[in-house]
Amino acid sequence: MRDAIPAHCYRRSVAIGVLFLSVAYAMYGVTTYLLYTAQSLWALIAFAVIRGLTIGPTFIVGHDACHDALTPSARWNRVLGQIALLPSWHSFTAWRFRHNFIHHRHTQVLELDDGYPPADEAQFRRMTYLQKLRYRLSRTIPFAGLLYSQEWFESHLLPNAARRQDYKLAGRYFALDYAFVIAWMVCEIALFAGLFSRLGLINESHFHPATMLFFGIIVTQFFWHWEMGFVTFLHHFHPDVAWFRESEAPAAAERQLISTVHVKFPAGFNWGLFNILEHTAHHIAPQIPLYQLANAQAALKDAYPQRVTEEKFSLMTVWKTFAVCKLWDPTAKRWIGYPE
């Protein structure tokens, strides 16, 4: 299947990688400045939301680097990747391990993929009341971020001993990466808590530190988590896309082709998310850089027109996906609703 993608789609450049990181950080930096200097509550709310969404492009650059797709240099990918992942509070080593070696290796495999696999009816019935509530909410548009929040908290912010050992085995720089992330988090909290202004390093914000912490940290992270959960859901959930038991899963390449959805957003949105919406091509060949994904996706569509799942974005199609994709029946191989 990779042979269907032209060779030029695999070309990578340090200069272009640095350019995309610079653009992503420029968007993030401008919204951070506008949030910190906001003079009205409405401006504060608006810039907190926008700042959360601009974490997406920085994360996508880091995601590319974790696949060694951003540039042809492993060293540049590591450095640029960790810088890019800081606003999303992610360690390069931990994300690379969980995303590359679990999600990509086991895409759409119920027992193994950590990309929010759906429960079946029996699993749902065994859940506690709170677990059922969380599951139901996470499959709604407003609370799609819950899908990602639990993964981030348990696997990235406070990984248990077993996960930490996995990360250390996967990369010798895990402790250093994690230290960078914690330092970034502390600095970000200190900024909105007013510590830097008390030290005379910057001007005071217009609002009380508690208000700034709420909007600068909680609201911003809420909308970043929502963006991550929402986009990931659209990539791997669709009324016509199946999930598989491990014993019945197709070969890896076939599974990536038929199970990854290409959501066709308007061009501006696609650019703002650095082409990650061209997701089938990314799963077939993760080493393709984000700046070549559109060409690679078009080539796959030409080669496999009946097997690539495409969905033109609209409020109706998004509503349908969330409405239908609740529980998965692995025997009947279809989506089902919640039990009464």
Indicate residue ranges for each PLM-predicted region:
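Non-catalytic, topology-defining segments of multipass membrane proteins
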Residues: 1-54, 86-219, 291-340
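Active-site His/Glu-centered metal-binding helix of metallohydrolases
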Residues: 65-66, 238, 284
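Membrane-spanning helices that line or support transport/gating and their immediate boundary helices
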Residues: 61-65, 98-105, 229, 233, ...
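Aspartate-rich (DDxxD/NDxxD/DxxxD) Mg2+/diphosphate-binding motifs
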Residues: 61-79, 107-120
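Transmembrane alpha-helical segments that form the membrane-embedded catalytic/substrate-channel core
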Residues: 52-62, 91-95, 143-155, 217-247, ...
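Active-site-flanking alpha-helical
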Residues: 31, 66, 70-71, 243, ...
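Cytosolic juxtamembrane regulatory segments of multi-pass membrane proteins
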Residues: 249-268, 323
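C-terminal, well-structured subdomains that either form a transmembrane helix-short loop-helix hairpin
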Residues: 271-293
